[in-house]
Regions:
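Short N-terminal edge-element motif at the start of the domain
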Residues: 1-34
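Polar/charged alpha-helical tracts
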Residues: 8, 12, 90, 99, ...
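Well-ordered, non-membrane alpha-helical segments in soluble/globular domains
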Residues: 10-21, 106-119
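N-terminal interaction modules that seed assembly of large macromolecular complexes
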Residues: 25-65
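Surface-exposed acidic, glycine-flexible loop patches that form ligand/cofactor-binding
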Residues: 26-30, 124-129
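Polybasic, proline/glycine-rich intrinsically disordered low-complexity segments
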Residues: 58-113
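Glycine-rich, aromatic-bearing surface loops/beta-hairpins
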Residues: 125-174
Length: 174
């Protein structure tokens, strides 16, 4: 395991930021049902921001074509809540520059991405997210490896019913 980052601390910071932003979004859109929440990153997992989707947003302007495409979702809260995450990821980068990693994917990328996924999973298990809220962690310009991580995350984070809806959507629009 890498000595560059405390993955438990990262997961905790992500959980706190997600819980705060999701709660704020629920308050802001209290007359509307939140249907999706996603964490977006890059292939080096050096950035992290969130997006969300509501029933009203989905039905306005016929956004059904992007229902399961978080990079197209139009809602978010202030990313200031992710400042601690950004600081930790930036510190990782400084240390990372000083070392060469033979197993970069296994030591850096995968566990960082996994910390993001586990944060959402724990919040789902704690009841922060209702069962009908689609959750995802994804790269905004993904390599094949990141697509595999996203797919595994979707399976871990969502019910069979949501995955079936996602697969139907993907067959139609993906």
């Amino acid at each position: 395991m890498s000595d560059l980052i405390d993955f438990d601390k990262l997961k905790s910071l992500v959980k706190d930021a997600v819980k705060t932003t999701f709660t704020n979004l629920q308050r802001i859109h209290q007359a509307d049902e939140l249907l999706g929440y996603a964490l977006c990153t890059d292939d080096s997992v050096m950035t992290l921001y969130h997006v969300a989707m509501t029933q009203q947003w989905l039905t306005q302007d016929d956004n059904t074509e992007v229902e399961f495409s978080p990079v197209e979702w139009g809602l978010s809260d202030r990313d200031v809540h992710f400042k601690g995450v950004a600081t930790l990821l930036a510190a990782r980068l400084e240390l990372e520059d000083a070392k060469l990693y033979e197993n970069y994917l296994e030591e850096i990328i995968n566990p960082t991405f996994n910390a993001f996924v586990l944060a959402l999973l724990e919040l789902r298990q704690e009841g922060v997210f209702a069962k009908n809220v689609f959750l995802s962690v994804l790269s905004t310009d993904p390599s094949e490896h990141m697509l595999e991580l996203e797919s595994a995350a979707n399976r871990m984070l969502n019910s069979a019913e949501l995955l079936n809806r996602f697969n139907d959507w993907h067959a139609r629009f993906g």
